[in-house]
Design a protein with these regions (language model features):
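Fungal secretory targeting signals
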Residues: 1-19
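Structural signature of eukaryotic scaffold interfaces centered on beta-propeller domains
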Residues: 97-121, 165-175, 235-254, 307, ...
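Beta-strand-rich domains and repeat architectures in extracellular enzymes and scaffolds
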Residues: 30-134
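Loop/turn-rich, solvent-exposed surfaces of beta-rich toroidal or solenoidal domains
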Residues: 112, 123, 254-357
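Surface-exposed loop and turn segments in beta-propeller and other repeat-based domains
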Residues: 64-100, 146-163, 203-238, 286-307
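Blade-level signature of beta-propeller repeat domains, shared across WD40, Kelch, NHL, RCC1
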Residues: 357-385
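Short loop/turn segments immediately following the C-termini of beta-strands
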Residues: 112, 128-132, 184-185, 193, ...
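Beta-propeller blade signature
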Residues: 135-146, 192-212, 269-289, 333-343, ...
Length: 385
């Protein structure tokens, strides 16, 4: 009896994979209605914002840039035949280049924030870093001065407290006053760039022990979460929010998210069902800077299966996709794929230096960006289209 029940369970488990409309199973085009996110505002943000406002401790992106306390270093990655020659290449200061505590992942620019390409006349990059199991910081970089400053991401847990955020932050996208950050298993988080808070430069995160102030592990500024978009299907039909990018050629503008899946990776079901690799787009509201929703639900406008494993980031513009695939540490290189729907992708093997990650596209400069993750070999790279 138990044996029969077990066989029945395995059979149902296999059927569940086979009939899930979100999985590829020899398909390429998927139905966007099956990829939904629930919008949830952060309940304790207004009270904390009111407090920091009353203390004169709300600052701006411009002020963060003007207070930048670290310098990028002009440095080219090691190149060989077949590599894509970057138009620009920058390294972090020595401490950030060498640290194994923090690992860079995502990149976006002021050209994502606004179509004109600048934020208050500043050309800016933002790069995300994660500290495994602990926290996330983002670097605000002024492209004119080549100076930068780190800011910690936080989640308000009460009307008078906040905590660090322990996610991978594999991709980011800046849209108006919102910084979108992927949360691998849960969806997309949104952070309020109109509410950057100045805190005490002291140990600990959140309310200080004496209850008289706030701190963020010695960082001067924190960026609070304003809302999140939860993957409604959950673990019953998982989607990996590995990277994210903005497409201004779509109408309306869209956010595209995609999955990092290892070559040959399968689910742990009896049939060893291949883990799908999907790219999904969500429409944006240019006025509110939110995802477009109906009764609090964001539904994908486009979903597609793209059979390229180990992808760390991608951008799309005018129906052309530029895709960043990593292959490991040096001497290995990263690959660039250029793809259009219904066509075979063009592969540029070894195009990137090792550790290529998330991507961002700058319509004004006609260039795309990536950031490399491995310690002592970290770069921000710009390539002309």
């Amino acid at each position: 009896m138990r044996y029969t029940s077990f066989l029945t369970f395995l059979s149902l488990f296999s059927i569940a994979f086979a009939v899930d409309p979100r999985y590829c199973q020899s398909k390429t085009t998927l139905d966007g209605k099956d990829f939904t996110l629930e919008e949830i505002d952060t309940p304790h943000l207004p009270a904390l914002a009111k407090y920091f406002g009353s203390k004169g401790k709300i600052t701006s992106v411009t002020a963060v840039l003007q207070s930048a306390n670290r310098d990028l270093i002009k440095r080219s990655p090691p190149l060989s035949n077949g590599d894509g020659p970057p138009a620009e290449s920058w390294a972090w200061n020595s401490g950030d280049d060498k640290t194994t505590e923090w690992i860079p992942q995502g990149i976006t620019s002021s050209a994502d924030a606004f179509g004109k390409g600048t934020w208050n006349d500043h050309e800016v990059w933002i790069v995300s870093w994660y500290r495994k199991g602990e926290s996330v910081r983002v670097s605000f970089i002024d492209r004119k001065t080549n100076k930068y400053r780190h800011v910690m991401l936080v989640y308000p847990t009460a009307d008078d407290d906040f905590e660090s955020i322990s996610i991978h932050a594999g991709g980011i996208a800046w849209y108006g006053n919102v910084l979108y950050v992927v949360d691998t298993n849960k969806g997309i988080r949104a952070f309020d760039l109109d509410n950057i808070w100045e805190v005490d430069i002291a140990a600990g995160v959140g309310k200080t022990k004496d209850g008289k102030g706030y701190s963020a592990d010695e960082y001067r500024y924190v960026l609070p979460q304003m809302r999140h978009y939860n993957w409604i299907a959950g673990d019953a039909s998982p989607f990996r929010f590995s990277w994210i990018s903005l497409d201004r050629s779509d109408s309306p503008d869209t956010l595209m998210v995609g999955e990092f899946v290892r070559d040959g990776e399968t689910f742990e079901d009896p049939n060893k069902t291949p883990v799908p690799i999907r790219y999904v787009k969500y429409n944006l509201d240019a006025d509110t800077r939110r995802l477009q929703t109906n009764d609090g639900i964001a539904t994908a406008s486009w979903a597609y299966c793209v059979n390229i494993p180990n992808v760390q980031g991608a951008v799309s513009y005018d129906s052309k996709f530029y895709i960043s695939r990593s292959t490991g540490r040096a001497p290995k290189k990263g690959d660039l794929f250029i793809w259009e729907e219904g066509k075979t992708a063009t592969e540029h093997t070894g195009w990137f230096s090792a550790g290529n990650e998330d991507m961002s596209y700058n319509l004004v400069r006609k260039e795309y960006y990536t950031v490399t993750e491995y310690d002592q070999d970290r770069h921000i790279l710009a390539y002309k289209v």
